[in-house]
Curated annotation (Swiss-Prot):
One of its GO terms (molecular function) is flavin adenine dinucleotide binding. InterPro entries: FAD/NAD-bd_sf (IPR036188), FAD/NAD-binding_dom (IPR023753), Fd--NADP_Rdtase_type_2 (IPR022890), Ferredoxin-NADP_redctase_2 (IPR050097). It comes from Geobacillus thermodenitrificans (strain NG80-2). This is Ferredoxin--NADP reductase. Binds 1 FAD per subunit. Its EC number is 1.18.1.2. It comes from the Bacteria.
Length: 332
């Protein structure tokens, strides 16, 4: 298959369309830069949109609480003011600096060119840890779920949630008032989730099965109909009827090809200085993918790092530009 080529050279290309990448792209527009975003998923929003769109976030400044998808939608609206070029479903495989100082970015579908690059790829590419039962894959896309995009699809249904971390407990609590019944199964006696959430779980109508694991899936072409649970210590088995199974065993993340781009990597993160500069001039990193002394991995911190990365890229392209931008209230 031939790879397309976009010969336009952008001022800045943002790799990763999560919250930090989206805000970086907006800020690039604010600083009158020509911006492109390349995102591997089919939609913007990163893990917020892919993993927990229905969950509330409580540590974004100015929002007492905001649903993850609502935050993504607000970022999209903010971004739309400057109409950046957005390339979805593309994974950057190679990043090369050319003789003229510009960068060539090769994805699985297209070749791109840019004067600077900002990497905001979060934890890198991520895949869910799947249910290790031979027949599980045949139910994916039916009623076996690793991602949840709409809680209402479980209304009035008998739901089994597998896992013992924050996601499993949080989804169980959110499903309780909607589903006909919710059962959570965890292989250990104690949950790893936040203490307050576990307390809520124990006081809810959610049926808790510990220490059990799903041992067998019984179903047909339409999906899973029953799940056989096995007691981890005693080996006793019981079968429960289900309409849907949600697996929250966490995710496996990897920097993937980024490790081969010549960047200084420390503990699966890209090392940057206070200007968000990497060891490659013209390449910057922001958000969860970067690290420096005192780094905290929060969306709120990524929102602060994005304008620094953009302003650094701006002065790299134009040394006469000011690092300190004008206040946005004076621009519109």
């Amino acid at each position: 298959m031939s790879v397309r080529e976009d010969r336009n050279v952008y001022d800045v290309t943002v790799i990763g369309g999560g919250p930090t990448g989206m805000f970086a792209a907006f800020y690039g527009g604010l600083r009158q830069m020509n911006v492109k975003i390349i995102e591997s998923l089919p939609q913007l929003g990163g893990q917020l949109a892919a993993l927990y769109p229905e969950k509330y976030i409580y540590d974004i400044a100015g929002f007492p609480k905001v649903r993850a998808q609502e935050l993504v939608d607000q970022l999209k609206e903010q971004l739309s003011r400057f109409s950046p070029t957005i390339c979805l479903n593309q994974s950057v495989e190679m990043l090369e600096k050319q003789e003229d100082g510009t960068f060539k970015l090769t994805t699985d579908k297209e070749i791109h060119y840019s004067k600077t690059v900002i990497i905001t790829a979060g934890n890198g590419a991520f895949q869910p840890r799947r249910l290790e039962i031979d027949s599980a894959s045949q139910y994916e896309g039916k009623n076996l779920h690793y991602f949840i995009s709409d809680l209402q699809q479980f209304a009035g249904k008998r739901v089994l949630v597998c896992g013992g971390g924050d996601s499993a407990v949080d989804w169980s609590l959110m499903l309780e008032p909607i589903a006909a019944s919710v059962t959570i199964v965890h292989r250990r006696d104690k949950f790893r989730a936040h203490e307050h959430s576990v307390e809520q779980l124990m006081n809810s109508r959610v049926q808790v099965k510990t220490p059990y694991v799903p041992a067998e899936l019984i179903g047909d072409e339409q999906g899973i109909r029953q799940v056989v649970l096995e007691h981890v210590k005693e080996g006793a088995k019981e079968t429960i009827d289900v309409d849907a199974v949600i697996v929250n065993y966490g995710f496996i993340s990897s920097l993937g090809p980024i490790k081969n781009w010549g960047l200084d990597i420390e503990k699966n993160s890209i090392k940057v200085n206070s200007r968000m500069e990497t060891n490659i001039p013209g390449v910057y990193a922001a958000g969860d993918i970067c690290t420096y002394d005192g780094k905290i991995k929060l969306i709120a911190c990524g929102f602060g790092e994005a304008p620094i990365a953009i302003s650094s890229a701006k002065t790299y392209i134009d040394p006469t530009a000011r690092m300190q931008p004008a206040h946005s209230s004076s621009l519109f």
